[in-house]
Swiss-Prot record:
Protein name per the record: Eotaxin
Biological role stated in the UniProt entry: In response to the presence of allergens, this protein directly promotes the accumulation of eosinophils (a prominent feature of allergic inflammatory reactions), but not lymphocytes, macrophages or neutrophils. Binds to CCR3.
InterPro entries per record: Chemokine_b/g/d (IPR039809), Chemokine_CC_CS (IPR000827), Chemokine_IL8-like_dom (IPR001811), Interleukin_8-like_sf (IPR036048)
Gene3D superfamilies: 2.40.50.40
Gene it is expressed from: Ccl11
Gene Ontology molecular functions: CCR chemokine receptor binding; CCR3 chemokine receptor binding; chemokine activity; protein dimerization activity; receptor ligand activity
Superkingdom as given in the UniProt entry: Eukaryota
Family from the record: Belongs to the intercrine beta (chemokine CC) family.
Keywords of this entry: Chemotaxis, Cytokine, Disulfide bond, Glycoprotein, Inflammatory response, Secreted, Signal
S-S bridge residues: C32-C57, C33-C73
GO cellular component: extracellular region; extracellular space
Principal location listed in the UniProt entry: secreted
Location(s) in or outside the cell: Secreted
Residues with glycosylation annotation: T94
Length: 97
């Protein structure tokens, strides 16, 4: 009887730890960039972007999403990347008529 009680306790403890880990999926990056584009992407092709700054990723990057749904990694230190993110920020803030 004591053995089954101890096993039940261990099972419940393990389950509670598992649910706590799964409750924080935001701490795990969904993607990391390993290479970055060397070509400038025209603003007319860009739809959105996200910043990859997680410590688990080797490179800090901007991931642009194009109007065709393609994701492209770019170096956030490049001037064209900074200009493109500013353009997208302004575009998203401007209300459409």
């Amino acid at each position: 009887m004591q053995l089954s009680t101890a096993l039940l306790f261990l099972l419940l403890t393990a389950t509670s730890f598992t649910s706590q880990v799964l409750a924080h999926p935001g701490s795990i990056p969904t993607s990391c960039c390993f290479t970055m584009t060397s070509k400038k992407i025209p603003n007319t092709l860009l739809k959105s972007y996200k910043r990859i700054t997680n410590n688990r990723c080797t490179l800090k990057a901007i991931v642009f999403k194009t109007k065709l749904g393609k994701e492209i990694c770019a170096d956030p230190k490049k001037k064209w990347v900074q200009d493109a993110t500013k353009h997208l920020d302004q575009k998203l803030q401007t209300p459409k008529p």
